[in-house]
Amino acid sequence: MATLQQQKIRIRLKAFDRRLLDTSCEKIVDTANRTNATAIGPIPLPTKRKIYCVLRSPHVDKDSREHFETRTHRRIIDIYQPSSKTIDALMKLDLPAGVDIEVKL
C-alpha cells in the first residue's frame, strides 16, 4: 500500500493573556481558510501555572509570605495542504507582541 505523506504546518502559540491568544488564533485560522487550506484548531493544551513565594518582610517574619503566579496558556493549530499563498499570508500576518509562536513544517 502506497501512503501519501500529507503536508502539514503545526503552529504552537503561548501567551500569558488568554484573550490575546484567542484573537491571534482566530487571525491564523481565518488566514488559512482564506487561502483554501484546511485549519484544524485551535486545540487548547493544559495551562501551566508557575507560583512564586516571596517573603513580605525584608528582614524577619518568615511567617508572612506572599504568593504570585503566572499562567501560560497554550494552543495548537494544524494547517493541512498549505500552498505558497498560505505560507506568504501567514508570514505577513501581524500578531501581538505578547504571543510566542513556534512553527513546524
Curated annotation (Swiss-Prot):
Highest taxon listed in the record's lineage: Bacteria
Signal peptide: none
A GO CC annotation given for this chain: ribonucleoprotein complex
Keywords, ordered alphabetically: Ribonucleoprotein, Ribosomal protein
MF term (GO), any: structural constituent of ribosome
GO BP annotations listed: translation
Similarity field: Belongs to the universal ribosomal protein uS10 family.
Summary of the function given for this chain in its UniProt record: Involved in the binding of tRNA to the ribosomes.
Assembly mode: Part of the 30S ribosomal subunit.
NCBIfam families: PRK00596.1 (NF001861), rpsJ_bact (TIGR01049)
Protein name: Small ribosomal subunit protein uS10
Gene for this chain: rpsJ
